[in-house]
From Swiss-Prot:
Residues 1-98, 236-357, 400-531, 944-1069, 1115-1242, 1464-1593, 1714-1865 form the C2 domain. The N-terminal first 124 residues can be classified as C2 domain, based on their 3D-structure. They are not sufficient for calcium ion or phospholipid binding. Changing E1323K: In a breast cancer sample; somatic mutation. Ca(2+) 1 binds at D976, D982, D1038, D1040. It comes from Homo sapiens. This is Otoferlin. Residues 129-145, 660-678, 1314-1324, 1352-1361 have a biased composition (Acidic residues). The keyword Transmembrane applies. Its cofactor is Ca(2+).
Length: 1997
């Protein structure tokens, strides 16, 4: 569907100049090219094309403007041509020559010649002439099929055609045809038509023709992006998406988990910090740490909530650090940090991991940073799957500044700001007292006062403030402001403003409004601070009639959708950044309430009179409970129209009209004569007359409106802020269009329709056009006086965003290719989210409209329509989407009544026409109604024709027949206790309903029934009904023999309409069957496959209707089957069923299942399994494979479900249903023959080589260890040999495509001469844990690499095309290759040694694979050939029951299916190895019972849910398998939430009887039963029989001894031989040494192995292992084998379904008992910490600050002592003796500390075992970082000692001490200078000077002293051999320090005293005096000797 404008010439122009033309239609403009130096005539000759999605209306306009073009100044308008398209719509082709008009609408001489063509998509108007635009008839057919191909990019300016070049016709046709048909279509030469204009630039077309001629797919060529589709391809519009049940407000389960790891840089001296974690009102505390500014906690807290999402996300998470908290005192707050839960939930994975929270003091905002707390915060809702980063081996090397606990985009330095919430006044409050109380009051007081005492309360960031109470006022006036102080930007998204009624007993909320700060601010470069109003906000809540116990009170609190207007509040908000340096600033963050400056009445906008009109065209589906009393519908807007409980006052003052208003109305609208002077004569009519409903069927009633449709109209007065709503509407229109397009594309991808990329281009084109249109429309009314600052800023922001979005859409459009559709679709989803966000206007104006159904004057059900959706504008884009349209509304119950099953029934379905606009625009209010009515006025008489009608009488009506083709449904809701249902469908259309037949006991009914609705009368014009037919409602019910039918779900559809004059032929008819999603509340409840057509009955009656030609072979009596042409085309398929066995069958009616059988049914055909004679003894079937043939649709999407039912055969021929399962999609079981058209191997190899050269950085030389693909002469795939070489000197793991220098950095088994600088780890020192931690490092690094690249599944699919070529590269190695490549880049960019340091540190250790998830998710549930089907019984639970599908599972059927078309081609059946016994199921092992040794290794658990009151748990492992139940209760781990178990358990089991392994974690309790924390279940049987060989993981290397010993009893060569035999693969052929050939692959590798004694022996195991690790590359039989691994499984608790209770790391090995016995289990017991002794000698101190003043002299001195500890102040604190009266800050100690400790090297943690409190039963193990704390103190005799300074040394990495005190600086400790870091565990002995620091008054670090210390680390054995004494004691005592004797007395030692008191203080003064004295002496000598000398000189002596 498109409109083409051919602009030919503009003539009679005046003067010479450059001309340009602008052509505008529907707001989208195209410019012509500039014609230079035109004189009289401008010959444009250009064609412009508009793809139009909706039919062109006959009233639409086309506008062409001609300008004089200027490069410098703006273009000057010459004239305008406007044309109404009525004639074009009727005739499809018009050519016009006409004059232009100027600005004043005066005709000018200049004329224009234009040709206009239009073709509607439905063919109702016009068709292209044979030779017009597309010449080829077949091409026209294709054009019709694809419906739309857009040929022109918006804004592209085609150049005019030079003579002699091909015409548009040929070029355009070849482009369109080539684009659409690709290589299947050849181009035909066409005769040239000289009069055809150019549409595309010729150069482009020539390039295009060259590119397309190559036979490539056109959509892979960038120039092909000119093909775009703007009309819907899928029939998505026929599926209206209507959600019935309110989702907001329903409580859900949430879990907030917070791990407090540590704190750093806490401000304060010698503090004892405790961290308090608050979520909402719940508080939890960590333990207290003494005397440290950087405490380490690692404590985990969990908070559980069951509340609605809105309440949850507004809760505040507060993390505070408190100093010296104990039982008696609450402690002093150091600092706190807060954010709301919603901020955390909106993060990726709903969590912050290892982030630092910045602490600030709320009581002193000028004090700055108070420290950091490192924590993990996660918020989990039910069903959320969170990827938790791995817990093990956390290092505390942290970049604090780069990892702050802040959402992305929030600056790290947040400033304090004041939030001023200004509350002005409120209006329209409801009365808040019962009428009884009101009468009592009146009796006592004697006057009727307003029955409400309102005040406003504001909640923000955990604080609240409230205004004063205005006594007895429905229209209170406050003019107050509530001031909050918080950091900006705040981490709390919403502010809650609530009007409350003050009451003696308890205050009640009247209404609530939430201010979303993101919507009233912008954080961009050109953004603005939050600002709002002054603007009115509307509040909604419960109905206005006051009752003491209001069941809907929650609605007034803002929970759930309000059902009635409550009040409106005039408020404003402003934010001011605070200058914290200002001395006058109040530094507290307490909420203040101040007076605010009053504002004028007109500030919020000029009051205008609005007019709302509505017409009820139909009211049906009225719930039968309301069917016995007359029903009326009431429409309200604000309090207007509410006659029951609306206005609190009887009279509302009319807004005064300004004097000029009347004249203005007179002039513009000529309305005043019609309205009899005063509009007050026009009384509002807000409700329909009461009418008694009539029966539709047993559930529903309808109102018999017939041709008389009741109307309502309401006048109301509101501030005129339409511009806000207009802008929101434009964006909504763009967003709706975009959403429709994206849904269409997703449907295309889902249903595999061709060319989704073309549709996406069309969507992007429409988006960019919409954005341009917004920019042109939104900038109106700039000078509006009542525009707030937010209006102005939002407009600028929206215009910037949409301009940017339009540009991005244009760029994306050019980039769309077939393989990038999914990526670009995601980007478009982001556009959609942004548009929806921008369109949500935060400043309200007109309240929403409520439609209430009243029965017996009581409110029953309601619908709410946003006013902006109904707002009228003369500009189409600004009009609300439902304005002047007939809208279908489904009325629902208010508040909580609408939850659950009560909300599923429709209360009423109303077809309603609504229009809202200014009274001045009232003449338009009937413009959208279906035509053919007469108005009925309320009053008669002259001058009343402008009065609105009270009802409409329709004289025009159309007769229709509806055919509902109900084919089948699938995955329906189980409504009976058997787990099945007896479903039937009821179809409602207008006032009629019909039912399908009932099908018993199925969840996938195939009704195959056509329902015909005759004698349907629809009112209005036929073409209107064609475009927008009424909605069909389909409800599915379960037939019950007793009681009424149970509701199972509902869906909606729109029929395809055929008019009487239309042919019933393709492409529109007959309609295609489609799936409609069935909803039950908000949950999906299956799919309905159906089609609906609405056929107009013409003058000839039903004879003209298409005949019903059903299948002739079936006679079903009165039931008409779906006719041919609509029912699917069937083909014969064979369904093979593998019956393996049944598992875990539960009792039926208390009786055990003994003789079960499985029945398989599909499309009426089926097969039964053999009977299991004794389920207890052997639950497997003895006949494995059976098959049946069935007719299935050709289209796989329409395949019916396959039903699996298990019955128990009882005595006397009875049988009982045990459970059932419906396979809703057979797709994954369909066998597809291999594709012979796969690209040839030559191409593959060529690509592979290219990949390798790229990966090797361009070098084509092959480094050792890479895969070399060589070609043998034979071409077929099977014969290709792949060489995988592995030299003895190279790695034991093939790393493919990795350059040599990267290889050096990888893990190796054997050392090489390549890396002399890297030490080999001593194998005797390594254990399994070394391997585990090395593997975790690798996993973490891989995850880190994946984060920035963000490869997700879709992208992975695309990458696979090339990745698949990379021979033997497994997933793990791919990731590692990428990791190494990235690391190499970062290192080369780094400098020298520093960048290589991390690489050198990593030792060469063999690794295993650590999976951060279950093994099943990595290997497709091990369902490679054996599938597990859960059998269900019992009713499906509803959300509110909290029941899950788990509870309905009564057993499992194991088997498989294979579906294929018959007969199979011979070559296919030969290649697939088809067998007459087992069919397609080849190589199936026997299912006889087998004994297996199961070995379970449980490594550790993480993040367990606390089970005890103290917030901890005492976990132990429990394992169940069959009858074996192991409880490892004795080895529980005390008070741990991250316990390391390190256990292995051996269990002998017999498959199939014992195949479900349960590993549970229990909490040990001293008293009472132990509680289950969580459990995980593993199906061992599927693992055992899987081709992935999950019995025992394949290790990375083969070793016969050491930590990496081979675990499997079978060696790699034996495993390889077995696999080749089972898979019928040729091989393995070993030899020569180090070489093996399997099928057509050759692997080479080391041929020797070293035994325990270091002897080298020849072996084939290395190459065999290499072949196993690349088994997926073996043709046909190859698949990925499970590597040696540890899997991480979530722990779940049945009591808390859907929420993880922690994670468990484990792996399972299985060994058949008939094979050689495996070796002893691996020892994975937790590493015992190693005992060490740290000896610290404190030699001296220097430059210690002097704290004490001497009593006599005032001299400064200090009594210094040094304190140190390693584990904690309480555990091992040690003090030196005191150096008294240090006058210089120098202290001499020679004092030794001894710290024995237990240390875990792998985790770099010290292990402490101690009782948590005196009441604790046992010791708890703690792990803390190895940090030595040294403090310097000033000793006082009477008062407490004074803390002077401290340093904390991390023993793994601390700065090397300075050699002298002078070289020791403060920067060594603060990290401001690069100091070499040392580890005491490597150096063993370190001596030096270290600085001691403390914070001054400004919270800045200052140097308070230096300490000379020596650290010496010994193991416990070494310490025992070489003992030393504590302090200065024996053995090996230290000598006494040589301290100056400062305990002197003046008169005994005056000189010494003088030295200390005078010299130290006045030494410089004394030196200067001495120097001066010497100079004076010298001068005196000179003067004394000069005379004598002079005399001698004179006398010449």
């Amino acid at each position: 569907m498109a409109l083409l404008i051919h602009l030919k010439t503009v003539s009679e122009l005046r003067g010479r100049g450059d001309r340009i033309a602008k052509v505008t239609f529907r707001g989208q403009s195209f410019y012509s090219r500039v014609l230079e130096n035109c004189e009289d005539v401008a010959d444009f000759d250009e064609t412009f094309r508009w793809p139009v999605a909706s039919s062109i209306d006959r009233n639409e306009m086309l506008e062409i403007q001609v300008f004089n073009y200027s490069k410098v100044f703006s273009n000057k308008l010459i004239g305008t041509f406007r044309m109404v398209l009525q004639k074009v719509v009727e005739e499809s082709h018009v050519e016009v020559t006409d004059t232009l008009i100027d600005d004043n609408n005066a005709i000018i001489k200049t004329s224009l010649c234009v040709e206009v063509r239009y073709q509607a998509t439905d063919g109702t108007v016009g068709s292209w002439d044979d030779g017009d635009f597309l010449g080829d008839e077949s091409l026209q057919e294709e054009e019709k099929d694809s419906q739309e191909t857009d040929g022109l990019l918006p804004g592209s300016r085609p150049s005019s055609r030079p003579p002699g070049e091909k015409s548009f016709r040929r070029a355009g046709r070849s482009v369109f045809s080539a684009m659409k048909l690709g290589k299947n279509r050849s181009h035909k030469e066409e005769p040239q038509r000289p009069d055809e204009p150019a549409v595309l630039e010729m150069e482009d077309l020539d390039h295009l023709a060259i590119r397309l001629g190559d036979g490539l797919d056109p959509d892979s060529v960038s120039l092909a992006s000119v093909t775009a589709l703007t009309t819907n391809v899928s029939n998505k519009r026929s599926k209206p998406d209507i959600k019935m049940e309110p989702s907001a407000g329903r409580p859900m389960d949430y879990q907030v988990s917070i791990t407090v790891i540590e704190a750093r840089q806490l401000v304060g001296l010698n503090m004892d910090p405790v961290v308090c974690v608050e979520v909402g009102d719940d508080k939890k505390y960590t333990s207290m740490k003494e005397s440290t500014n950087c405490p380490y906690y690692n404590e985990y807290f969990v908070f559980d909530f069951h509340v609605s999402p809105d309440v949850m996300f507004d809760k505040i998470i507060k993390i505070s650090v408190i100093h010296s908290k104990n039982l008696l005192r609450s402690g002093t707050l150091v600092g706190s940090f807060k954010m709301d839960v919603g901020t955390v939930y909106s993060q990726p994975e709903h969590q912050f991991h290892h982030k630092w929270a910045i602490l600030s003091d709320p009581d002193d905002i000028s004090s700055g940073l108070k420290g950091y707390v490192k924590c993990d915060v996660a918020v989990v809702g039910k069903g959320d799957n969170i990827k938790t980063p791995h817990k093990a081996n956390e290092t505390d090397e942290d970049d604090i500044e780069g990892n702050l606990l802040l959402p992305e985009g929030v600056p790290p330095e947040r400033q304090w700001a004041r939030f001023y919430v200004k509350i002005y006044r409120a209006e329209g409050l409801p009365r808040m007292n019962t009428s009884l109380m009101a009468n009592v009051k009146k009796a006592f007081i004697g006057e009727n006062k307003d029955l409400v005492d309102p005040y406003v309360q504001v909640f923000f960031a955990g604080q609240k403030g409230k205004t004063s109470v205005q006594k007895s006022s429905y229209e209170p006036l406050w003019n107050e402001q509530v001031v909050f102080t918080d950091l900006f930007p705040p981490l709390c998204k919403r502010m809650k403003v609530q009007i409350r009624d003050s009451d003696k007993v308890n205050d009640v909320a009247i209404g609530t409004h939430f201010i979303d700060l993101r919507k009233i601010s912008n954080d961009g470069d050109k953004g603005f601070l939050p600002t709002l109003g002054p603007a009115w906000v509307n509040m909604y809540g419960s109905t206005r009639n006051y009752t003491l116990l209001d069941e809907h009170q929650d609605l007034n609190e803002g929970l759930g959708e309000g059902v009635s207007f409550r009040a409106r509040l005039l408020l404003g908000l402003a934010v001011e950044i605070v200058d914290t340096s200002n001395p006058e600033l109040t530094s507290s963050t307490e909420v203040q309430v101040e007076q605010a400056t009053p504002i004028s009445e007109s500030c919020a906008g000029k009051m205008e009179e609005f007019f709302l009109f509505g017409a009820f065209l139909e009211a049906s589906m009225i719930d039968r409970r309301n069917g016995d009393k007359p029903i009326t519908f009431e429409v309200t807007i604000g309090n207007y129209g509410n006659e029951v409980d609306g206005l609190s006052r009887p009279q509302r003052p009319r807004p005064r009209k300004e004097p000029g208003d009347e004249e203005e109305v007179d002039l513009i609208q000529n309305a005043s004569d019609d309205e009899a002077g005063d509009a007050g004569d026009l009384a509002s009519v807000s409700s329909t007359p009461p009418m008694r409903p009539q029966v539709t069927d047993r559930n529903y009633f309808h109102l018999p409106y017939l041709e008389r449709k009741p109307c309502i109209y309401i006048k109301s007065w509101w501030p005129d802020q339409r511009r806000r709503l207009y802008n929101a509407n434009i964006m909504d229109h763009i967003a709706d269009k975009l959403e429709e397009g994206l849904n269409d594309i997703q449907e295309m991808i889902k249903t595999e329709k061709s060319y989704p990329e073309r549709r996406l281009r069309g969507v992007l084109e429409e988006l960019s056009c919409g954005c341009c249109r917004f920019l042109s429309l939104a900038d109106k009314d700039q000078g509006h006086s009542s525009r707030t600052r937010l209006d102005r800023e939002r407009l600028k922001s929206c215009m910037r965003e949409l301009e940017n979005m339009g540009q991005q859409a244009r760029m994306l459009r050019a980039q769309v290719k077939r393989h990038t559709v999914r990526d670009k679709l995601r980007l478009c989803q982001n556009f959609l989210q942004k548009l929806r966000f921008l369109a949500d206007e935060p400043q309200h104006s007109i309240p929403d409209i409520f439609i209430w159904m009243m029965s017996n004057n009581k409110r029953v059900a309601y619908a709410r329509v946003p006013s902006k959706d109904l707002l009228f504008s003369i500009v189409e884009e600004e009009t609300g989407k439902d304005c002047a349209k007939v809208k279908t509304l489904f009325l629902k119950l208010p508040g909580k009544r609408g939850f659950g099953s009560a909300g599923w029934t429709v209360q009423a379905k109303v077809e309603l026409y609504l229009w809202l606009g200014l009274s001045k625009q009232r003449k338009e209010f009937l413009c959208g109604l279906p035509c053919g009515f007469q108005e009925v006025k309320a009053a008669q008489g002259l001058g009343l024709h402008a009065f609105p009608p009270v009802s409409l009488v329709y004289t025009k009506k159309q007769a229709f027949q509806l055919r509902a083709h109900m084919y089948q449904a699938r995955s329906l809701f189980a409504a009976d206790s058997s787990g099945l249902s007896d479903p039937f469908a009821r179809v409602f259309f207008i006032n009629q309903s019909q039912c399908t037949e009932v099908l018993n006991e199925t969840l996938c009914p195939t009704w195959d029934q056509m329902l015909v609705f005759d004698n349907l009368e629809l009112y209005g014009e036929a073409h209107e009904l064609r475009d927008d037919p009424p909605i069909i409602v389909i409800e599915i019910y379960d037939q019950d023999s007793m009681g009424k039918a149970d509701f199972m779900g509902r869906t909606f559809a729109k029929p395809l309409v055929k008019m009487a004059d239309e042919a019933y032929c393709p492409p529109r008819f007959p309609p295609q069957l489609e799936y409609y999603q069935i909803y039950r509340g908000n949950a999906t409840a299956g799919d309905l496959l159906a089609a609906f057509e609405l056929l107009q009955i013409g003058p000839a009656g039903k004879a003209d209707l298409p005949p019903i030609n059903g299948p002739v072979d079936v006679d079903r009596g009165p039931i008409m089957p779906v006719p041919m042409g609509i029912r699917p085309v069937l083909s014969k398929y064979r369904v093979e069923v593998l019956f393996w066995g049944l598992r875990d069958l539960k009792r039926v009616n208390l009786a055990q299942v003994d003789r079960p059988r499985v029945d398989i049914e599909c499309a009426g055909k089926g097969v039964q399994s053999s009977l299991i004679h004794n389920y207890k003894k052997n639950p497997n079937f003895n006949t494995l494979v059976k098959w049946f043939e069935v007719d299935l649709p050709e289209n796989e999407l329409l395949h019916p479900p396959l039903n699996i039912r298990v019955v128990d055969c009882r005595a006397f021929g009875r049988y009982t249903l045990v459970g059932s399962h419906a396979v809703s999609s057979l797709r994954r079981f369909i066998y597809r023959p291999p594709d012979r058209s796969a690209p040839s191997w030559n191409t593959t190899v060529r690509l592979l080589r290219r990949c390798r050269v790229l990966c090797n950085g361009g070098s084509s030389s092959h480094s050792t260890g890479e895969v070399v693909v060589t070609m043998e002469p034979e071409v077929p795939i099977k014969k290709l040999e792949t060489m995988v070489k592995l030299d003895a000197t190279s790695e034991a793991v093939v790393k493919v495509d990795v350059a040599e220098e990267e290889k050096e950095k990888k893990k190796k088994k054997k050392g090489t001469a390549e890396e002399p600088e890297e030490e080999e780890p001593d194998e005797s020192m390594l254990d399994w844990w070394s391997k585990y931690f090395a593997s975790i490092d690798t996993m973490k690094e891989q995850l880190r690499q994946q984060e920035p690249s963000g490869i997700d599944l879709e992208e992975k699919e695309e990458v696979d095309n090339t990745e698949g070529l990379k021979g033997s590269m497994k997933g793990k190695e791919k990731a590692r290759a990428a990791k190494e490549e990235k690391k190499k880049k970062t290192q080369s960019s780094g400098s020298g040694q520093g960048s290589e340091a991390p690489e050198k540190k990593k030792p060469k250790i063999d690794e295993l694979k650590v999976y951060p998830k279950e093994l099943e998710s990595e290997f497709d549930n091990f369902e490679d050939w054996l599938h597990t089907f859960n059998l269900l019984r019992g009713k499906t639970g509803d959300d509110e029951d909290g029941s899950t599908e788990e509870e309905r599972i009564v057993g499992r059927f194991k088997g498989s299916l294979c579906v294929y078309k018959v007969p199979l081609p011979e070559d296919v059946s030969r290649e697939a190895g088809y067998d007459s016994t087992y069919g397609m199921f080849q190589g199936i092992p026997s299912n006889d019972p087998i004994n297996v040794l199961v070995r379970v290794y449980v490594v550790r658990a993480t993040d367990l849910h606390p089970a005890d009151i103290n917030g901890k748990a005492d976990p132990y492992i429990a394992i169940r398998l069959g009858k074996t139940d192991i409880r490892d209760k004795e080895n529980y781990i005390s008070k741990q939430l991250n316990p390391v178990f390190g256990k292995s358990f051996d269990i002998e089991a017999s498959f199939p009887m014992e195949s479900m392994l349960t590993v549970a974690v229990y909490d040990w309790d001293l008293v009472g039963t132990d509680d289950l924390i969580g459990e995980t279940k593993i199906d061992l049987e599927n693992r055992f029989y899987s081709k992935h060989r999950a019995t025992c993981g394949i290790a990375q290397t083969y070793s016969t001894h050491g930590y990496n010993i081979w675990r499997d009893p079978m060696k790699p060569s034996q495993i390889l031989t077995r696999l080749c035999k089972d898979g019928k693969v040729d091989g393995p052929h070993f030899g020569p040494p180090g070489r093996v050939k399997v099928a057509n692959r050759v692997f080479t590798g080391p041929s020797e192995i070293e035994d325990e004694n270091g002897q080298r022996k020849p072996t084939d195991e290395h190459v065999a292992l290499l072949a196993l690790r690349h088994w997926e590359d073996i043709p046909r039989a190859g698949c990925r084998l499970v590597p040696e691994h540890v899997e991480t499984r979530p722990l779940l608790n049945p009591d808390k379904p859907g929420i993880e209770q922690g994670r468990l790391e484990l792996w399972v090995d299985m060994f058949p008992m008939d094979m050689p016995a495996p070796g002893t289990p691996l020892d994975i017991s937790p590493r015992k910490p190693k005992k060490y002794e740290l000896r610290v000698i404190i030699w001296n101190t220097d430059e210690v600050v002097l704290e004490d003043d001497d009593f006599f002299t005032g001299e400064k001195s200090s009594d210094i002592f040094v304190r140190g500890w390693l584990k904690g102040q309480q555990e091992d604190k040690q003090d030196t003796d005191v150096h008294y009266h240090s006058l210089t800050g120098e202290g001499n100690f020679n004092w030794r500390y001894l710290f024995p400790f237990d240390y875990l090297a792998a985790e770099e943690k010290i292990v402490i075992s101690k009782k948590e409190s005196m009441f604790s039963w046992d010791e708890t193990e703690y792990k803390i970082p190895a940090r030595l704390t040294l403090q310097i103190w000033d000793a006082d005799h009477f008062s407490a000692d004074d803390f002077l300074g401290a340093i904390e040394l991390d023993l793994n990495r601390f700065p090397r001490g300075a050699k002298t005190a002078k070289q020791c600086t403060m920067e060594m400790a603060t990290g401001e200078v690069d100091v070499p870091l040392v580890s005491i565990f490597k150096q063993k002995r370190v001596k030096g000077w270290w600085p001691l620091l403390a914070r001054n008054e400004n919270d800045e670090f200052e140097l308070t002293g230096k300490v000379e210390a020596e650290l010496h680390l010994l193991t416990a054995e070494e310490a025992e051999k070489n003992p030393v004494g504590l302090a200065r004691n024996e053995p090996d005592p230290l000598e006494k320090p040589n301290r100056p004797d400062t305990s002197f007395i003046w008169f005994l030692n005056p000189l010494k005293s003088a030295r200390y008191f005078l010299w130290h203080t006045y030494r410089w003064l004394l030196l200067k005096l001495l120097l001066l004295l010497l100079l004076l002496l010298l001068l005196a000598l000179f003067l004394y000797s000069v005379p004598g000398y002079l005399v001698k000189k004179i006398l010449g002596a």
